[in-house]
Swiss-Prot record:
HAMAP family named in the record: Ribosomal_uS7_B
NCBIfam families linked: rpsG_bact
PANTHER family assigned: RIBOSOMAL PROTEIN S7
Keyword Cell division: no
GO molecular function: rRNA binding; structural constituent of ribosome; tRNA binding
Family: Belongs to the universal ribosomal protein uS7 family.
Tagged with keyword Phosphoprotein: no
BP GO terms, sorted: translation
Protein species of origin: Phocaeicola vulgatus (strain ATCC 8482 / DSM 1447 / JCM 5826 / CCUG 4940 / NBRC 14291 / NCTC 11154)
Superkingdom to which the source organism belongs: Bacteria
Annotated protein name in UniProt: Small ribosomal subunit protein uS7
Length: 158
């Protein structure tokens, strides 16, 4: 076990929306230190979202935040060995981990989509998540279903 808990790194807000959440998302999206490319992909995706949902009164950023909320899991299962048997124990997720999981899932399922550019794939996944559909939303539902199925083992807290 480590001696001291590491300090939280300060993440600077992004240049366009002045939002830390956007910076975190772009950091997850980034490959090989190419942050400018990640920003371009993200902003292009938000533009595409705005053009595909023109009658929505919310801004593209608000749509993205709602999509993130829709794919954010509240509970997960962790493996715990008790007397030779391994149980899947449902546990609540810390707020920072919730955010991280939702961002990673949104990006993962956007990357898995076929064909087009990453900006288009990300935009499509954001729209699906906003409408409570798509791979990232399904992953969240599966996590919740798994926790519900293993509710009997909730007393094996960590």
């Amino acid at each position: 076990m480590r001696k001291a808990k590491p300090k939280k790194r300060v993440i600077l807000p992004d240049p366009v929306f002045n939002d830390q959440k956007v910076s975190k998302f772009v950091n997850h999206l980034m490959y090989d230190g190419k942050k400018n490319t990640s920003y371009e992909i993200f902003y292009a995706a938000l533009e595409t979202v705005k053009t595909k949902l023109p009658n929505e009164e919310k801004s593209a950023l608000e749509i993205w935040k709602k999509a993130l909320d829709n794919v954010t899991p509240q509970i997960e299962v962790k493996s715990r060995r008790v007397g030779g048997a391994t149980f899947q124990v449902p546990t609540e997720i810390r707020p920072d981990r919730k955010e991280s999981i939702s961002m990673k899932n949104l990006i993962l399922f956007a990357r898995k989509r076929g064909g087009k550019s990453m900006a288009d794939k990300l935009a499509a996944e954001i729209i699906d998540a906003f409408n409570e559909q798509g791979g990232a939303y399904k992953r969240k539902e599966d996590m919740h279903r798994m926790a519900e199925a293993n509710r009997a083992f909730a007393h094996f807290r960590f």
